[in-house]
Regions:
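Carbohydrate-associated surface elements
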Residues: 167, 189
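Conserved donor-binding/catalytic core segment of Leloir-type glycosyltransferases
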Residues: 201-219, 225-228
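Conserved acidic donor-binding segment of nucleotide-sugar-dependent glycosyltransferases
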Residues: 326-333, 342-347
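Acceptor-binding helix/loop patch of EC 2.4 sugar-transfer enzymes
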Residues: 40-66, 107-152
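Glycosyltransferase donor-sugar binding loop
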Residues: 20, 211-212, 216, 239-254
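Short hydrophobic beta-strand element within catalytic cores of glycosyltransferases
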Residues: 308-311
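Aromatic "clamp/platform" in nucleotide-sugar-dependent glycosyltransferases that forms part
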Residues: 291
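Nucleotide-activated donor-binding/catalytic signature segment of Leloir-type glycosyltransferases, i.e.
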Residues: 252-275, 285
Length: 406
């Protein structure tokens, strides 16, 4: 998004906590401090005397040790402090789902704020609770998701929210109690220059690819493995490539052993964008079996690469895939196996689906379109802000046609 906004002629700063993102060289990265405890070998020993001078540092450390996830809250405190000094440099602040208390203070200071909610994390929490083996694990799930109390409160008070699909819009209204008039839809974009077809990359004859956090129930990997077991009877040489990390001793590893699929499934992680793109390009078919997605980025990326896609109807996936792929009921391994089998057996269908998928992403989900829609919304928000200030000061000029979002 930041690259697309810069391409459109706007000035963009990205304020980020750790781990810091890799950005277009034209985008200014402003690094917020933090303990980065998820990259530290022994978090219990990460606290230093200087951190005791910062409530955010101490709270982040204490929360990590007690099973919490404090980063949305502590990031908000740090950003609020930064913008107290530098907020005058910006026309608008766009939050990427931290939904922290600091946003309300920033908005009250007079700086326009818009927040993206990709989907309400209450969905993730419920799926994790449903999959929890015992009360102890359920307690840990609730503790880790404790930040949701803050996110729900903040979402209800923010004036401007962006979401990335109609399904997410419905879920935000239902799960977070946000008023419909607060929400504006802007579909996510796919980088169609990076994620693109390449005829020089040979498509494997019997390879399914998926992306998944191996033991995250939301992603539906278990459903795909069940489908894979059935398909191997028809396609003995069939293999599955999972872009994700296999947790030793976890539920996925146990299911692999139960289904006798250890030799048919490969996990890869820590790969570059170039490697990811080539995995999409070389797959016979890409499976997206998620039980829920607020958008469905892997499906869009695969389609942009010209790969045929079979997806579940979990969340917003049907909005992304449309009629360019095959959509089956979420959680139904038999339906998933049947659809994958159709594609694996028909090279003509593979080619047609690949071409239709690429065209759909180019027409509906490119970043230039997403950026254009967001800038239009930014200008609408800025216009409201100008009117509000004029009402407070008695001014009447409402021309904001030259306003620039940053």
């Amino acid at each position: 998004l930041s690259k697309a906004l810069v391409d459109a002629g706007h000035s963009v700063d990205v304020i980020s906590g750790q781990p810091y993102p890799e950005l277009d060289e034209r985008v200014n990265l402003i690094k917020m401090p933090g303990l980065n405890l998820y990259e530290v070998e022994k978090p219990s020993r990460a606290l230093r005397p200087k951190h005791l001078l910062s409530w955010a540092d101490f709270f982040e450390w204490l929360s990590k040790l007690t099973g919490g996830f404090a980063e949305p809250y502590t990031f908000g405190r740090r950003v609020r402090k930064y913008l107290r000094q530098h907020g005058h440099q910006y026309d608008i602040v766009h939050d990427n789902q931290s939904l922290c208390y600091g946003l309300l203070d920033i908005e009250r200071s007079g700086l326009p704020v818009v927040a993206t909610i990709h989907h309400p994390i209450t969905r993730d929490r419920q799926l994790a609770l449903d999959a929890a083996p015992d009360w102890r694990f359920r307690l840990l799930v609730r503790r880790w998701h404790n930040f949701l109390n803050m996110q729900i409160k903040v979402s209800r008070k923010l004036r401007h929210i962006v979401t990335v699909s109609r399904q997410s819009e419905r879920d935000i209204i239902e799960q977070f109690g946000v008023a419909p008039e607060q929400i504006h839809l802007v579909y996510n974009g796919i980088d169609t220059e990076i994620f693109s077809p390449n005829n020089k990359v040979q498509r494997q004859p019997l390879r399914i690819m998926t992306t998944s956090s191996a033991d995250q129930p939301l992603k539906g990997l278990g459903v795909l493995l069940q489908a894979m077991a059935g398909l191997r009877e028809r396609f003995p040489e069939l293999e599955l490539l999972v872009v994700g990390r296999l947790r030793k001793g976890g539920a996925t590893e146990k299911l692999l052993q139960k289904l006798n699929l250890q030799d048919a499934v490969q996990f890869v992680s820590g790969i570059s964008n170039e490697e990811l793109v080539n995995h999409y390009r070389s797959a016979t078919v890409v499976a997206c079996p998620s039980l829920y997605e607020g958008f469905g980025l892997p499906a869009g990326e695969a389609m942009a690469c010209g790969a045929p896609v079979v997806s579940s109807d979990g969340g917003a996936l049907p909005e992304v895939v449309g009629d360019a792929g095959i959509v089956v009921p979420a959680g139904d391994s038999n339906a998933l196996a049947e659809a994958l089998g159709r594609v694996l057996a028909d090279k003509s269908l593979q080619a047609d689906m690949g071409a239709q998928g690429r065209a759909r992403i180019e027409n509906k989900f490119c970043w230039s379109l997403a950026a254009s829609n967001l800038v239009a919304y930014y200008r609408e928000i800025l216009g409201e802000s100008v009117v509000q200030q004029q009402n407070e000061t008695g001014l009447v000029d409402t021309d904001v046609s030259g306003a620039e979002a940053a």
